[in-house]
Amino acid sequence: MKKDLVFFLIDDDKDDIEIFDLALKQTDCLVKLVSANNGDDAIKKLQADDRFIPDYIFLDLDMPIMNGKICFEEIKKIKHLNKVPVYIYTTSQNPLDELKYLLSGATLFFFKPSYIKELVTFLRGIIDNTNH
């Protein structure tokens, strides 16, 4: 029996979290969404239980308390997460950001799409890739 995939979304925008959740539901796949509202909460959650290993992490860059840059660096220090793909999921259009994160080990730099259909297609691609 396959276990449900776990996606961990780190984003301070409640609307973006709802849209992400809705897009996941539209994939018609068994995926559990866990979220944190800022980098500090995310790191605490990830360090609190070394059995919590999401299948994928999606990280916004522009957040209060602990921004995505610092959060990304902290995630990379957590040994039990070293094989978890980290997707930078952001509105930042800075090509230097994209290059920096990809060179630092991010799996992909993905711009938050304007349409939910684009997000559904993107997420379905990740899920389909996981199941093969």
PLM feature segments, named:
Residues 1-8, 15-22, 112-132:
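Non-catalytic signal-transmission and effector/linker regions of two-component phosphorelay proteins
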Residues 14-34, 38:
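Two-component/phosphorelay signaling modules centered on CheY-like receiver
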Residues 35-44, 68-71:
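Helix N-cap/capping motif at the beta->alpha junctions
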Residues 48-52, 76-83, 104:
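Conserved phosphotransfer cores of two-component systems
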Residues 59-60:
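Active-site residues of response regulator receiver
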Residues 63-66:
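Receiver (REC) domain active-site loop signature in two-component systems and cognate sites
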Residues 70, 93-110, 118-121:
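Alpha4 helix (beta4-alpha4-beta5 surface) of REC/receiver domains from two-component response regulators
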